């Protein structure tokens, strides 16, 4: 019962049997050298990849229901419609579309540079901010009742049509002058 390396690679059981000098075909029987040996341990090898939370794959959403259309309003007042996926956070979505939402702490809840205003119609659809987000929002300039940190807003189907307005200014208390590169 040996497993193969993903995609037709080397059979792990074959390598183990060869190393031990026994060629087990099934439990209770063997081929090969004629020496008695313990059955080889079967291990599975898999090739896996990772996708950081909130990052869109090149192929786009798998199903149309995964798409959430939102609008960003930049500092000049220009409305910029964008499409994201369920599970994306607003900070990474804005950065992927070239919007000026800084995110100096790279979504670690250590700054307020991804501060946005959420449209009133959609604000109540978000879970309330936790204590750490509230602490960071306290340092955000131009704080309003509908202020939230973009890194903490995760897109859901209910946020279809939501507007996220960028405040006129932000303050980077994290590292003076540090501007991270989007992932």
UniProtKB/Swiss-Prot annotation:
GO biological process, one term: electron transport chain
Keyword line: 2Fe-2S, Electron transport, Iron, Iron-sulfur, Metal-binding, Mitochondrion, Transit peptide, Transport
Cross-referenced PROSITE patterns: 2FE2S_FER_2, ADX
Cross-referenced Gene3D superfamilies: 3.10.20.30
Disulphide bond pairs: none
Limits of the 2Fe-2S ferredoxin-type domain: 68-170
Cofactor note: Binds 1 [2Fe-2S] cluster.
Domain of life: Eukaryota
Span of chain positions assigned to the transit peptide in the UniProt entry: 1-52
CDD domains (alphabetical): fer2
Subcellular location: Mitochondrion; Mitochondrion matrix
Cofactor: [2Fe-2S] cluster
Binding positions ([2Fe-2S] cluster): 105, 111, 114, 151
GO cellular component: mitochondrial matrix; mitochondrion
Molecular function as annotated in GO: 2 iron, 2 sulfur cluster binding; electron transfer activity; metal ion binding
Family according to the record: Belongs to the adrenodoxin/putidaredoxin family.
Record note on quaternary structure: Component of the mitochondrial core iron-sulfur cluster (ISC) complex composed of NFS1, LYRM4, NDUFAB1, ISCU, FXN, and FDX2; this complex is a heterohexamer containing two copies of each monomer. Form a heterodimer complex with NFS1. Interacts (in both their reduced and oxidized states) with the cysteine desulfurase (NFS1:LYRM4) complex; this interaction stimulates cysteine desulfurase activity, and serves as a reductant for Fe-S cluster assembly.
Stated role: Electron donor, of the core iron-sulfur cluster (ISC) assembly complex, that acts to reduce the persulfide into sulfide during [2Fe-2S] clusters assembly on the scaffolding protein ISCU. The core iron-sulfur cluster (ISC) assembly complex is involved in the de novo synthesis of a [2Fe-2S] cluster, the first step of the mitochondrial iron-sulfur protein biogenesis. This process is initiated by the cysteine desulfurase complex (NFS1:LYRM4:NDUFAB1) that produces persulfide which is delivered on the scaffold protein ISCU in a FXN-dependent manner.
Protein name in UniProt: Ferredoxin-2, mitochondrial
Organism (species): Bos taurus
